[in-house]
Curated annotation (Swiss-Prot):
Function: Modulates blood feeding of female mosquitoes on vertebrate species by binding and sequestering different mediators involved in the host response. Binds leukotriene C4, leukotriene D4, leukotriene E4 and stable analogs of thromboxane A2, U-46619 and carbocyclic TXA2. Binds weakly prostaglandins: PGD2, PGE2 and PGF2alpha. Does not bind leukotriene B4, biogenic amines, ADP, platelet activating phospholipid derivative PAF and arachidonic acid. Inhibits agonist-induced smooth muscle contraction.
Organism expressing this protein natively: Anopheles stephensi
Signal peptide: 1-18
Protein name: Long form salivary protein D7L1
Induction or repression: (Microbial infection) Expression is not affected by Plasmodium berghei infection (at protein level).
Main location: secreted
PANTHER family linked to this entry: GEO07291P1-RELATED, ODORANT BINDING PROTEIN-RELATED
Gene Ontology CC annotations of this record: extracellular space
Keywords: Disulfide bond, Hemostasis impairing toxin, Platelet aggregation inhibiting toxin, Secreted, Signal, Toxin, Vasoactive, Vasodilator
Location of the protein in the cell: Secreted
Disulfide-linked positions: 37-73, 69-128, 178-211, 252-263
Pfam families tied to this protein: PBP_GOBP (PF01395)
Length: 315
């Protein structure tokens, strides 16, 4: 039965991918990838700053296992590489270009050359080192172009944010962003109840929770990402709750974001979930939060820092 369930999940993923045209990544989506891959792959030792300096400059160095897996993380996150197909997706390059060509000022000829070079790259086993070796020559040749296409410069990303006020801005939490989208300035008392974790079940609250779950990367079009929710419990020093978190989510009836939200709020995990959810709200306003060495202390500290949120740029 487990094998059948896994197979059905995989087939569902493929069907979702096949039925929807690929969408270009905006500046928020790209920034999330870069910072998350830093979080997951930067070493904790004395050479951490060296890696960060090199990666910030888009240099895939040093040539070691750490950089290899960082490169795979970014390629996967930017959807240049598809792990399900174990293939580089060269057909997505012109889609990314067309979406932002008036802002990036990239040249069609160079984009075509980049696409051809990526199409010729062989992912082989799909391991970190194989992907690194396959993509490195492409990267070195087209690094300036790829930085333009995937919003990898401060100036370029700023132009995208300015041109797209409809996406979450830097310094704005996903909770605040989704509140604006769902309520459009109306029914403020209802959203305040939502902020207090009251389950009103209103269409606006359901829309807001769906938006937040997607923004925090708890969900995407393929379904719930349980590991991401577990990670948030780990980040508030509650890793021992992982089995219970997984159990609550697995036994939850329904498949919408609000369904899972209700299950967590109504479970014995409620207070810990609130702490994890609030801490992620803070981090969602500043994707460099953890990279600056900041860690979870307590709920009061999170509330204090939330009051200080502004539009300070952290890139």
């Amino acid at each position: 039965m487990i094998i059948v369930a896994v197979l059905l999940s995989f087939l569902a993923h493929l069907l979702v991918q096949a039925s929807q045209p690929w969408k270009a990544l905006d500046a928020e989506q790209a920034l999330y990838v870069y910072k998350r891959c830093y979080e997951d792959h930067l070493p904790s030792g004395s050479d951490r700053k060296t890696y960060m300096t090199l990666w910030n400059a888009w240099r895939l160095e040093p040539n070691d296992a750490i950089t290899h897996c960082y490169a795979k993380c970014v390629l996967t996150g930017l959807q240049i590489y598809d792990p399900q197909e174990n293939a580089f997706k060269s057909d997505r390059i012109p889609v990314q270009y067309q979406a932002y060509k008036t802002i990036t000022q990239s040249k069609q000829k160079e984009v075509t050359e980049y696409q051809k070079a990526l199409a010729a790259a062989n992912a082989k086993s799909g391991s970190c080192v194989d992907l690194y070796n396959a993509y490195l020559p492409v990267h070195n040749r087209f690094v300036n172009l790829s930085r333009q296409l995937y919003h990898g410069t401060v100036e370029g990303a700023a132009k995208i944010y300015a041109a797209m006020p409809e996406i979450k801005q830097k310094g704005e939490s996903f909770h605040a962003y989704c509140e604006k989208r769902a309520w459009k300035g109306n029914k403020q008392s209802e959203w305040k109840n939502g902020r207090r974790y009251k389950l009103t079940g209103s269409p606006e609250l359901k829309d807001a929770i769906d938006c937040i779950f997607r923004g925090l990367r708890y969900m995407d079009d393929t379904g719930l990402k349980v590991d991401e929710i577990v990670r948030d419990f780990n980040l508030i020093n509650k890793s021992e709750l992982e089995p219970e978190v997984r159990s609550v989510l697995a036994s939850c009836k329904g498949s919408e974001a609000y369904d899972y939200y209700v299950c967590l709020v109504n479970s014995r995990l409620k207070q810990h979930f609130k702490n994890a959810f609030d801490f992620h709200e803070l981090r969602s306003a500043d994707y460099a939060y953890l990279l600056r060495g900041k860690v979870y202390e307590n709920p009061e500290k999170v509330k204090e820092e939330m009051k200080k949120l502004n539009t300070t740029v952290h890139f």
